[in-house]
């Protein structure tokens, strides 16, 4: 799977009408001879305006890639705050926000073992959520630093993810009602998380509110992801399916093709998946 850039228009968050111009990051797993940890490249430059990203993307291939364009909600404009975040072989990114963040941040930190608390270097709620995931994984009996040869497995990652979301909800539920009303606290959490150990990926589309819509998430699978036009520089892609296999799986916050009615647009994950 080649790392390739999308045009500016497809990087826009169309549902909320904002440009994700506050930096970006890519993370990808390389040959096992180089170790289990992923390679990271982050920048505070908008993704569509970074010539180094274009140079790297045209010459980089990986079996598993994370890519994230940032629109600041928490934390300053800094490379420390650009997703994805990594520890050992684990890679994490997030689209959304933790409800009541200012009210739960201290208590979330108090739940963490010192090494996970001290391991947070940026100021985003997303990185703190990753620290909570690492702490949860360790409490389940799995060392997040161990980098197992075949990964932790989807069952373990899924269980740790569900527990992490449950912990976040518990912290928010414990905000006193008087504080919620007095400070007009938005307790809704948008938790579109993605985590991988280089072998398995767990993605969530979740909102804590029963009356609001979760942030969008789309997927497409097939045998080949290629440009629709053979012209050099084309960035209009489509998923090819030569058989029933799924050699390529793409998950994204926005539709991945301009063609309406394709799998990338119609296979929308339901809230809570």
What is each residue range found by the language model?
Residues 1-94, 98-273:
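Conserved short alpha-helical segments that host acidic/polar catalytic motifs at enzyme active sites
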């Amino acid at each position: 799977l080649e790392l390739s850039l999308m045009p500016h228009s497809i990087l826009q968050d169309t549902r909320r009408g904002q440009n994700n111009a506050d930096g970006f990051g890519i993370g990808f797993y390389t040959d096992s001879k180089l170790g289990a940890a992923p390679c990271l490249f982050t920048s505070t430059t908008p993704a569509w305006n970074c010539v180094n990203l274009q140079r790297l993307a045209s010459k980089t291939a990986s079996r598993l890639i994370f890519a994230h364009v940032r629109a600041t909600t928490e934390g300053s404009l800094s490379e420390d705050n650009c997703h994805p975040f990594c520890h050992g072989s684990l890679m994490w990114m997030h689209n959304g926000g933790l409800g009541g963040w200012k009210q739960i941040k201290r208590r979330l930190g108090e739940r963490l073992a010192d090494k996970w608390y001290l391991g947070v270097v940026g100021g985003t709620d997303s990185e703190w959520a990753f620290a909570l995931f690492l702490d949860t994984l360790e409490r389940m009996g799995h060392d997040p630093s161990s980098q197992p040869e075949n990964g932790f497995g989807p069952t373990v990652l899924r269980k740790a993810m569900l527990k992490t979301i449950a912990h976040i909800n518990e912290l928010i539920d414990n905000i006193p009602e008087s504080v919620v009303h007095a400070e007009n606290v938005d307790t809704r959490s948008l938790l579109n998380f993605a985590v991988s150990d280089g072998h398995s990926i767990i993605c969530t589309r979740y909102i804590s509110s029963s009356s609001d819509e979760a942030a969008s998430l789309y997927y497409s699978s097939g045998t080949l992801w290629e440009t629709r036009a053979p012209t050099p520089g084309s960035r209009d892609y489509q998923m090819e399916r030569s058989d029933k296999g799924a050699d390529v799986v793409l998950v994204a916050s926005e539709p991945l093709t301009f063609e309406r009615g394709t799998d990338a647009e119609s296979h929308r994950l339901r809230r809570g998946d």
